[in-house]
Amino acid sequence: MESQRNILLIGLLFVSFLMWQQWQTDKAPKPATAQTVTQTNAASQHSADVPEADISGVPVELPANKNLISVKTDQLDIKISPIGGDIVYAALVEHKREIDSSDPFVILEQKNNFTYIAQSGLIGRDGIDSSANGRAAYSVQTNSYSLADGKDTLTVPFTYTADNGVTYVKSFTFTRGQYDVGVDYSISNTSAAPLQVQMYGQIKQTIKESESSMMMPTYRGGAFSAQDTRYEKYNFDDMADKNLAKVTLGGWAAMLQHYFVSAWVPPATDSNTIFSSMSAGGMANIGFRGAVYDIAPGATQEINSQFYVGPKNQKELSAISETLNLVVDYGFLWWLAIPIHWLLMFYQSFVGNWGVAIILITLTVRGGLYPLTKKQYTSMAKMRNLQPKLTEMKERFGDDRQKMGQAMMELYKKEKVNPMGGCLPILLQMPIFIALYWVLLESYELRHAPFMLWITDLSVQDPYYVLPLLMGLSMFLMQKMQPVAPTMDPMQVKMMQWMPVIFTVFFLWFPAGLVLYWLVGNLVAITQQKIIYAGLEKNGIK
């Protein structure tokens, strides 16, 4: 009886989790129309590109593709506009667009009706990027740069000389094996007057709906970090409703999507303003305005920042900023998901296969829960031995549920049986299941990670639904191994009969890695059940 109810409990918890998850998905922001943006941002509809003190700006100026500056490293394929020095294209050469494609995954781009670029410049009283005068037009030595073999870094300088003779050098520094780019300014004030400038960096993106589903909800939108807010999502609806303006020491601003992130990270010791805006036509902006620098005549000023564009690699993100790794959002069970992710990475480093690593995770979890599982099945066996007495009670008390309940509690107390003893392993397993769900959903390492045979990507559903069907069959076998108690409500019996079918249908669209975890867990549970029952029979408990 307890086994049947435990399976029913799993089902109810599982369905409740899915309903909660779908509610979160339904609450996700929808792409705003141009009309809505115009109405909600009438006072700032010119806030397109250059964030002055009042966050006003000018339209994007992009040269023809042949004039873009190409930079290639072992990780990045970047294109930079000489007008303003904006990064207008970024592809990840080690990550494919599709599992069966040779094309790299593109994060930043501008084509057709979609814009996703990273802008930066100098604003303020003597800034060279302003709404009044436009963007600085830089000169470069060549249109193509590549990280040479044997070299660990590549610096690409952009030079601009203003009318007053002041020279501005905007440098992009790339490092082998990394996705972060140093974006730095060197300003030599050769004029007779002091200069005052302020750096800004922002990410500009056309509002685009996340490719989300009930079984794989994902987030696309902004996020930021500040002294009083370690990590907060700021979605497109938030940007449309209110311009963000948060003064902080350090901080960062980012645009997130499934598995990947782009982020501006100003110096941690500077006072910065994290801002957002929404321009007419549904163009979202999030970024930072840095410290104001006063440069005396004859002086040279260095201004530094970092821009990250790549996968949500927690180790690399943490090295850039101690809170940037929080963009890998494991939900409310993050404290449990983090060690699961670490253990998954640990196993994979030895076996070299993510599917095998998931199997090892399953064995670890089931092994850790074995003492509780043994207590569960022992309690269930004792409950079965009490079935004749429970049946006699049902006949004696009939429909008097109150007296029946009191008599059952007295019997449990006398026989030292805990009717809820079988629930604890289930209650402990569900948080682990949900945490692993988020690990598989959020960890970029599992994107396009193969297992064996037809399972070429553990982060998406089984293309032939073999694993979900096997999982349903394993649930059916577990159910058949437990007799239906005569005291069990007929409605519960019917629900139990349909539970394997319901689970199978749900799991059809779950990531194959998660289904693999549940399938192996069921097989281990069946094996443990046989071993435990064999031991109980030797002790006279059947």
Swiss-Prot record:
NCBIfam families: PRK01318.1-1, PRK01318.1-3, yidC_nterm, yidC_oxa1_cterm. It is a multi-pass membrane protein. Interacts with the Sec translocase complex via SecD. Specifically interacts with transmembrane segments of nascent integral membrane proteins during membrane integration. It comes from the Bacteria. Coiled coil: none annotated. GO terms for molecular function: membrane insertase activity. This is Membrane protein insertase YidC. It is found in: Cell inner membrane. GO terms for cellular component: plasma membrane. Required for the insertion and/or proper folding and/or complex formation of integral membrane proteins into the membrane. Involved in integration of membrane proteins that insert both dependently and independently of the Sec translocase complex, as well as at least some lipoproteins. Aids folding of multispanning membrane proteins. GO terms for biological process: protein insertion into membrane; protein transport. Keywords: Cell inner membrane, Cell membrane, Chaperone, Membrane, Protein transport, Transmembrane, Transmembrane helix, Transport. Belongs to the OXA1/ALB3/YidC family. Type 1 subfamily. The chain crosses the membrane at residues 6-26, 326-346, 350-370, 421-441, 458-478, 501-521.
